[in-house]
Structure formats: structure tokens, C-alpha cells
Amino acid sequence: MISPLAYIHPEAKIGENVEIGPFVFIDKNVVIGDNNVIMPNVNILYGSRIGNGNRIFPGAVIGAIPQDLKFKGEETTAEVGDNNTIRENVTINRGTAAKGKTVVGNNNLLMENVHVAHDAIVGNGCIIGNSTK
């Protein structure tokens, strides 16, 4: 189900059986796989790639531009694999250099207020505790 209060850019690609809550913002150049739950007030921004079976809790921001003064608008991505739990207010920034990427693998738990910085790679099966930066 997609809430009528969500905004999904017409160029975004959304998979099958995706739940999208109210006040979610999904930007252009975003790909979201199947069987995801995206709860209210989540922002999935330009260049984000979300796999299958993820749960994204309220206030998460995925794909914001990197907090790096070297960034000049290059095409970069934030990539989230499959079966992750991304809790409240988690931020995952895009990569910095051209074709750079920030990656969160599969089967991870990112607890509340975690920040995954530009160009970071989180492997598979990780648990990252509250407010880790």
C-alpha cells in the first residue's frame, strides 16, 4: 500500500509489494526493490538504491549529499542491500567522488540515530548501535 500523502517522483522505480507510509519523499533516480516497508517521514533521495525486504523506520534519510566540501554534484549513490532494519533517524549519505558509493550490505541492523558517512561500506550481518557516527 502506498499512502496518498507520500510523494514519489514519476521517474522513481518502485518494486512489488512495497508499503510506503504518509509523508515519505522518494526522489528521482531512486530504485526500490520488492517487499520493503518504508514508514512515515522517510526521505529517500536522488541516487539511492534499496534492495528487497528492508524495513525503514520514521525519520530515516537515505541518499543525502555527502558532508564533504570536495563534493561538487558528481553522480554518486547510496546503496542498501536486502533484509536490513534501518531504525529511526538513521542517515546514509551518498558517495563523494564521481561514481562513488556508500554501501550497506545485507541483514544489518542500524539502530536509532546511526550515521553512515559518504563512501563507507557496511558489510553483511552487522549490528550498529544507537547514535554511532
Model-derived regions: residue spans:
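Structural signal for interior beta-strand "rungs" in well-ordered beta-sheet cores
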Residues: 2-133
